[in-house]
Amino acid sequence: MVLRSEILTKKSELPTPDQALPGRESAMPVPEAHFVNGRPLTAPFPAGLQQVLFGMGCFWGAERRLWQQPGVWVTAVGYAGGYTPNPTYDEVCSGLTGHSEVVLVVYNPQETSFEQLLKVFWEAHDPTQGMRQGGDIGTQYRSVIYTFDAAQKAAALASRESFQAELAKAGYDRITTEIADVPPFYYAEAYHQQYLAKNPNGYCGLGGTGVCLPA
């Protein structure tokens, strides 16, 4: 078993439930409205909208890319896929929560398709890098898709195989993206929400491979 001290220093190993930080019962307070479009950040959302969680490295740049997509109703950043309830950003960065930085995407399926969002996801980052994304190193930067229903999961798995074939042609390694049913989602602190709209010159590590997902 990997020691807790090794997780803190190497940042490439996920903790076990026993090693994870305890967290807290109270949820993180977040703004009522999206900084860019003014829509509610939290449920309930209007009927007919669908949701997905995408993790593609640092969530600042990922959220901006996603809120810019036609048909996306609202976005929010947070943490998912780990063990610690209601973690703080510093706790997630320690590697001892097991969470990935993710973007909650709420979209209108009458205006965009899940397949179109998958295309944005695959092409906007490098899904072969394991527990990092570019210069951002740690388990919190791993590539993930957390789906809300069986149809989404099937589409995500099919798109992964399709994109893998294109990556192989370009000489890339195997995709490491985790695709799973949606786990609990915990909102990140208010200052992380729509960070790059509030800080236009802020850090954005988002970068793709140049490989395209076939239609």
From Swiss-Prot:
<dbReference type="InterPro" id="IPR050162">
    <property type="entry name" value="MsrA_MetSO_reductase"/>
</dbReference>
<dbReference type="GO" id="GO:0036456">
    <property type="term" value="F:L-methionine-(S)-S-oxide reductase activity"/>
</dbReference>
<feature type="active site">
    <location>
        <position position="58"/>
    </location>
</feature>
<keyword id="KW-0560">Oxidoreductase</keyword>
<dbReference type="GO" id="GO:0036211">
    <property type="term" value="P:protein modification process"/>
</dbReference>
<dbReference type="InterPro" id="IPR036509">
    <property type="entry name" value="Met_Sox_Rdtase_MsrA_sf"/>
</dbReference>
<comment type="similarity">
    <text>Belongs to the MsrA Met sulfoxide reductase family.</text>
</comment>
<protein>
    <recommendedName>
        <fullName>Peptide methionine sulfoxide reductase MsrA</fullName>
        <ecNumber>1.8.4.11</ecNumber>
    </recommendedName>
</protein>
<dbReference type="GO" id="GO:0008113">
    <property type="term" value="F:peptide-methionine (S)-S-oxide reductase activity"/>
</dbReference>
<comment type="function">
    <text>Has an important function as a repair enzyme for proteins that have been inactivated by oxidation. Catalyzes the reversible oxidation-reduction of methionine sulfoxide in proteins to methionine.</text>
</comment>
<dbReference type="GO" id="GO:0005737">
    <property type="term" value="C:cytoplasm"/>
</dbReference>
<dbReference type="Pfam" id="PF01625">
    <property type="entry name" value="PMSR"/>
</dbReference>
<dbReference type="InterPro" id="IPR002569">
    <property type="entry name" value="Met_Sox_Rdtase_MsrA_dom"/>
</dbReference>
<dbReference type="GO" id="GO:0034599">
    <property type="term" value="P:cellular response to oxidative stress"/>
</dbReference>
